[in-house]
Curated annotation (Swiss-Prot):
One of its GO terms (molecular function) is histone H3K27 methyltransferase activity. Residues 1-28, 105-126 are annotated as: Disordered. This is Histone-lysine N-methyltransferase ATXR6. Histone methyltransferase that specifically monomethylates 'Lys-27' of histone H3 (H3K27me1). Has higher activity on nucleosomes containing H3.1 than H3.3. Involved in the formation of constitutive heterochromatin and the silencing of heterochromatic elements. May act as a positive regulator of the G1-S transition. Influences which sets of rRNA gene variants are expressed or silenced. Up-regulated by E2FB. GO terms for cellular component: nucleus.
Length: 349
């Protein structure tokens, strides 16, 4: 469909024409639009047209569910050749190149740094620890082969999403410059990450640079799409990852219907200064962590991570942190609507 630009919604029903006496409203809801999955013409604004067969599907009837109309061409499951994503090759050199892993002459230094942070905390009294909890670095899996499998699972998801790996916020020409990211602009202020917290985050970054990734597996679910599961026990208050991607002004993305993974970075009093993180081109594992259903008690019970924005050296950063102990094999979830409450989650599992 290239002759007329439209949002590929309101799929026509070729099986019948509406009677002349019907109103335009009845025509739109009962005749002009239909979902091939539920056979309903309701909510025509959420019906997506296949660019090949022109059949309609509700965004929430698709598997996995779509939360917004995608950019460019879209093909229904019958017309699409997309099946289970092809796994990234479990070859060390390819994984090292994909993640740009730095070779370290002595990786034991990283482990000792993590242990020293833990020893410092043990000296703190129980009373003090209750008053001021501290962030923990994640503990990588001990088995190097298992870490390769974990990274290969992430590479599979990134490649299927046509996304390059990045573990930092990126500032590119034509979008928001780094100078725009000033935590001081945050409406109501932003909490400052402590010196020890900054050191803990830096340790997590260093471990990832050396291939000691978080103990997580990216798993493709036919209902939810790519999901993330804990591959070992994770303690409460452990840093899971930083939410990264291209930084842009919110005003540039207000009409981005495909920006379902955008994250608030800066919620400024001046709307022109509001920033978002866009992981559609560059991202890490944060992009694939699932959101809870805010509309059901069962959905809220699944939450095991929280999204927290910190002032780090004057800049806004977003961290995903465990908000309780997480068992091995447990799927990771956090609240997509922690700030603006604008993300549609009513059809989430």
């Amino acid at each position: 469909m290239v002759a007329v630009r439209r949002r590929r919604t309101q799929a026509s029903n070729p099986r019948s024409e509406p009677p002349q006496h019907m109103s335009d409203h009845d025509s739109d809801s009962d005749w002009d639009t239909v979902c091939e999955e539920c056979s309903s013409g309701k909510q025509p604004a959420k019906l997506l047209l296949c660019d090949k067969c022109d059949k309609g599907f509700h965004l929430f009837c698709l598997r996995p569910i779509l939360v917004s109309v995608p950019k460019g061409s879209w093909f229904c499951p019958s017309c699409s050749k997309h099946q289970i994503p092809k796994s990234f090759p479990l070859i060390q050199t390819k994984i090292i190149d994909f993640f740009r892993i730095k070779r370290s002459p002595d990786s034991s230094q990283i482990s000792s740094s993590s242990d020293s942070i833990g020893k410092k905390r043990k000296k703190t009294s129980l009373v003090m620890s209750k008053k001021k909890r501290r962030l923990l670095p994640y503990n990588p899996s001990n088995d190097p082969q298992r870490r390769l499998e974990q990274m290969a699972s992430l590479a599979t998801a990134l490649r299927a999403s046509n996304t390059k790996f990045s573990n930092e916020l990126t500032y590119v020409s034509g979008k928001a410059p780094r100078s725009a990211n000033q935590a001081a602009f945050e409406k109501g202020g932003m909490q400052v990450l402590s010196k020890e917290g900054v050191e803990t985050l830096a340790l997590c970054k260093k471990m990832m640079d050396l291939g000691e990734c978080p103990p997580l597996m990216v798993v493709f679910d036919p209902y939810e799409g790519f999901t993330v599961e804990a591959d070992r026990f994770i303690k409460d208050w452990t840093i899971i990852t930083e939410y990264v991607g291209d930084v842009d002004y919110l005003s540039n993305r207000e009409d981005d219907y495909d920006g379902d993974s955008m994250m608030t970075l800066l919620h400024a009093s001046d709307p022109s200064q509001c920033l978002v993180i866009c992981p559609d081109r560059r991202s890490n594992i944060a992009r694939f962590i699932s959101g809870i259903n805010n509309h059901s008690p069962e959905g809220r019970k699944k939450q095991n991570l929280k999204c927290v924005r910190f002032n780090i050296n004057g800049e806004a950063r977003v961290l995903l942190v465990a908000n309780r102990d997480i068992s091995k094999g447990e799927r990771l979830y956090y609240d997509y609507n922690g700030y603006e409450h604008e993300y549609p989650t009513e059809h989430f599992v």
